């Protein structure tokens, strides 16, 4: 029902990405059961990201963002996080050739209720992907290509055993996401407020909804 309504909240208002510990929903139980049965060596955590984010203090959108989720309150750089960071560094190198300065790092504040943080806490290298915004690409068709490329690079790194934890330090050179954008800004609009005419900028933020199964 969450997908049908274009939200990760279910009809009962439960956010599945905050249910990794409580396991109150059948979907959460199914994922946890499969994780414990399959015992993955790596986990990929895929998200969509709103249009408001930049990659650092720059006038460009964050087209793709990554995160090696924290696994404790101290955000300790554990061995499995180093491996996740190394994967991100390799993906970022490819993307910088195509969308320079449009790759960011998402906030790594620890929340054990999130699926990615939970999987990382089990000492499994976990990489979070955020499909962000490319100018004019509200259906994320361009972004989809960059996510696909990144997945291929990540899988190649794993399959070719290129992950010894070396080079993870470059992860910290990737700028963090900042909230810097609106979808539309109307400049120098004349408004009458409190019987006084004022010139203001008006910012508009889109709300993504499905209409006839289209975004």
Where are these regions (language model features)?
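Active-site/substrate-binding loop(s) of hydrolase catalytic cores
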Residues: 1-88, 92-101, 120
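C-terminal accessory segments enriched in acidic
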Residues: 38, 72-75, 84-215
